[in-house]
């Protein structure tokens, strides 16, 4: 035999030995698994044992039926069964028990009833009569329960009532998973708590955490709050909830909606996420955005991410956008409370008759005054008004008058290059039917305005006066009156270049004017 042939035979022997060892290991593992499965099956098929009975009879000789009377005790795997009397069918491993039936499983679960049918092979039990299941502090009352002993699952289909220290829960259908301490309820689900009533079509309830999980349309009603959602959870122990899908919170002052809502009932604190709205029906106010938080006491809220405030009016609603909108309820010196709304950063206002832009503003529901700060601009029909700060006084949700403080300036367009301009230290504007009709300028008044006759320019007036009064009709200046040391001149309309006909401080901001509601979100 040559060396190559010898090596091939040696390698084959080693290969065969390796395969042989692998086969032995596989057979061992299979045998072990089969042995474990067989052990489990033997445990499962273990016969029901008789622990005690006052009297044991065999009514039918040759039959496997045994009759047990008085203080009956039976055992099967990890459960104990007690009753007044029972029939035990040993071959089929069945039990029929009567009177004061009690199943005990482990240290915590007890099941009581008037009648029991138990299949030891399948480890399934049916308990009827006045059924009570007790698992620690949770009590289930119903007329009939199917109990899967091996998996510790109890179910009922003919109305049940569950109680613990604080809550009483009822439903038509229920399933209890004892290992997970979880109930699944369906059909006419209701939780009654001293502070609220919770209802729904489908609900899960964890008995350890005392948390209810909603998987269908659900409502929570209390003395001062109403909650609706179609998905979410409510921690009944700590009064904390999280809701999704058409979530609504109504606390009698506001109605809060959002794609997702979090609420702590004890503190009155809530958060809402995406597509949120807060409606104040008493003041006809609606606030929208993509994030909000809310406190009930003291009452306050904040909205950001595409925040929008809407003052609802039948004739002309007002729309406000800002980076952040907040409101707080405060008290005055007379002890009365009122709401103060604030908006910060990039404020824009749109209504049909009035538009505005500023950095920040406030709105007092006490005196119905809107105050604009930091480079405010107001547009009313054809007129643009600017100053250091502005106060707009409203009545019946319409502008009544406005006051411009420091460097007041009013501008209107005559043609593409010419502007009527009036400026002064302060300005008061008056509205009729939400339209500007009169303006009073006080202190250091100056004016450049063009005279027209049948839409034809006939002159340009330069005027100075301590006091100027202007009348407006349909957005156009119709009359100007100068009081207290007036001084001025009238020039032909084309005697000056347009760029020279501008007062110090002139600006034209028409490019940033909101012309429709969506423009308030324009950067």
Where are these regions (language model features)?
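Bacterial Sec-dependent N-terminal signal peptides
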Residues: 1-41
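N-terminal amphipathic/hydrophobic interface segments
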Residues: 34-523
